[in-house]
Amino acid sequence: MTSEYPTLLSPLDLGFTTLRNRVVMGSMHTGLEDRAGDINALAAYFAERARGGVGLIITGGYAPNRTGWLLPFASQMISAADARRHRRITDAVHEAGGKILLQILHAGRYAYHPFSVSASAIKSPITPFRPRRLSARGVERTIDDFAHAASLAAEAGYDGVEIMGSEGYLLNQFLAPRTNKRRDAWGGSAANRRRFPVEIVRRTREAVGDDFIICYRMSMADYVPDGQSWDETVALATEVEAAGATLLNSGFGWHEARVPTIVTSVPNSAFVDISSAVAEHVGIPVVASNRINMPQAAEQILADTQVQLISMARPMLADPDWVAKAADGRAHEINTCISCNQACLDHAFVHKKVSCLLNPRAGRETTLVLGPTRRARNVAVVGAGPAGLSAAVSAAQRGHVVTLFEAGPVIGGQFDLAKRIPGKEEFAETIRYYTTMLDKYGVSVRLNTRAGVAELTGFDEVVLATGVAPRIPDIPGIEHPKVLSYAQAISGAPIGKSVAVIGAGGVGFDVSEFLVTDASPTLNLKEWKAEWGAADPQEARGALTTPIPAEPAREVYLLQRSKGRQGTRLGKTSGWVHRASLKAKKVQQLSGVNYERIDDAGLHISFGPDRKRPQLLAVDNVVICAGQESVRDLEDGLRAAGIRPHIIGGAAVAAELDAKRAIKQGTELAARL
C-alpha cells in the first residue's frame, strides 16, 4: 500500500464484513439495468471496476414494485427470476474481489408513467404525470416491497442494499413538507413524515438479518423550498441508524432543485462539510459524495472530517482503474472525471445507455475491446485534439507504433480553450492525462509540425484528426478590427467592456460566461454558494437562501439568428445551469436576429424576415461563435498519393464541437486497427 493515501486505501471493518478500502462506486443508472439481455454487459461493467480495486460498488436503482418504476418495465427487483438473473452480476464482482450493493429506488412522482404514486397528489415539475396519493394500505405494502426486494437481493448474492432516500425520490417526497401534505400517521408532524423511511429500514433489517449491509442514502440538503430542516435531517439520521442501517450515504439536491450539485462548475468537495456535520450525530460510517474525483482530495477529506468513506460514481466511469492507480503511486495516470455529464447523466435523463465522454468503453466493456494487436503497424495521427489524442493513445496501448503530429505548440485542441472557461478548469486534467499516456506508451509527439503528404508517406495508417476552424459568417464589416474569433477572445486578446457574441450554441454560452466573469466561482466555494443561494442547512430550511451573484465584468449581448429560447441544445443536466448563470450575470439574450453590418459604431442588427426594429449595439467588440468548419486540406493530397486516410473528430463532422463523438471515434478506430 502506498503511503500517499493511507486512510483512503485502508480497510473498514463493519463488524460482520470488511471493505478492502474506503472507495465506494456510487449508484448511477446505466441503461443496462432495464433489459434482461444486457445483464452480461452490466456484469462486465461492474467487474472491471471491482478488478480496478473499488471497495464497494452500488448498482443503479431497481424498483421494489411496479409503481416505483422510473419508466414502464424498467429495472426492478420483485421476483425470484429477477434475483436469479442478478447472480451473474454478483458472481462477476465477487470473483474480481469486490463487494456490491443493490440500490432499491422507488421513483415516486418522478416516474415517467401514469401509475406513479407519492406522499400527496402533487405533480413534479420535471415529469408529465400527476401522482396518485399513496393510501395508508399502499404505504404499508410499499414498506413490505422494499423489504422483499432486499431479501431477493440477498438471494441474488448481493452483499447488501442501498435504500434510495434522496434526490427527491419517493422517500424524500414523504420527508419534505413541500410534497407531503398528509394528515395521517405518515404526515403532518416531522416525526410522522420520517416514519416511512425509518420503517423501511427497520423492516428491511428484520427481513435480511444482521450480516447484511443496509446503506441509507439520505438527502442532507434538499435545495428546494419547504425542504427538510437541519433538526429533521439529524433526527432522520439517528432514527435510521437505530432502525438498523449500516452506512449512511450522502445525497444533495432534488432533481428539480435550482442549485447545481453535479456539474463541472460546482467546486470540488463542495458538500463535504455537510456530510461531516451529520456524521457527528451518528455512530455508523457516513459516506461523502459529489464532486470528489482525485485521491489527493479524497484522502484529505478522510483525514480532516468525520466521514469514513468516499463515494464516486462518474470518476469510476472515466477510469475503472482509479483505485489501482492510486494504490500503485500512479495517480497522475488517472483519467480524471471532468463532470461534463455529456455521455453519462445527459444520456440517463433521456433514457439512453450511459457511457463516458472520456472513456467510451464505459458500458461497452464486452464490445469495445482494446486488446493487444496481432500485427504492429506504423500509425500517423495528424492533430492532437481530443479525437487525435484518443486514437494515438489507444492505438499505442494496443502495441502499434504511433507518431502524433500537431501544428501548434501544445496538445489538447479545443480542450486547451475549454479549460479557460470559468467552471471548466478541470478540462486541464484531461490534457494532463493524455500527456502522461503519450509518454507512457511511447508515442512520438511532434509539436509545431504541420504534416504534409511527404511526412505522411510510408506510414501503414494515417489518421486525420485535424479538427475545425471557426466559421466566418458573411456579415458586412466582418474584417473590422473589433471583430474577434472565439479562440482569440478566450486566448487573451484585449476586449472592451461591452461585447456582442454572435452565435448562441455551446461555444457562445461558454464565451459569454468567460466575458462576464472576472474570477471563477468554481475556485471559491463561498462565492459559488452565494451565487446560487446555497445556504448552510443548519441555518435555513431546505438549505436555500437568496442568491447574490457577482456583478458582471462586462455588458454582454448573446445573439442568434433563429427564433426561440437560446441554449435548447445544451446538455440535459447542465443546460439549465448555463442559462441561469448568464441570466444572473445580466447577459441580454436576443433571438431572431439579422446581422446587418459591423462598423466603428458597433453591431447593427434587425429582427425577423422583414428586418424590423433596426438597432445599434454600441459594443467595443464582436466575438464570432457562429459554428465551425472541418479542416481537411490534407485529404485530397493524400488520396492523390494513394493514401486513404481515416478521418475522425471535427475533421469528419463539424456541425457542433463534440468531444464525446471525437474521443469515441478515436477509440473505436484504434480498436479496429
Q: Where would I find each of the regions flagged by the language model?
A:
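Conserved acidic residues
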Residues: 55, 159, 246, 308, ...
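N-terminal Rossmann-like dinucleotide/flavin-binding domain of flavoprotein oxidoreductases
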Residues: 413-459, 567-593
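Short beta-alpha connecting loops at secondary-structure transitions
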Residues: 258-264, 285, 308, 415-423, ...
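Flanking helices and flexible, charged tails adjoining ferredoxin-like Fe-S electron-transfer domains
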Residues: 201, 365-374, 397, 401, ...
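Flavin-dependent oxidoreductase catalytic cores
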Residues: 1-382, 386, 391-397, 401-402, ...
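A short helix-to-beta-strand connector/capping loop
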Residues: 306, 438-445, 479-483, 552-554, ...
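Rossmann-like dinucleotide/flavin-binding elements
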Residues: 377-407, 446-454, 458, 466-475, ...
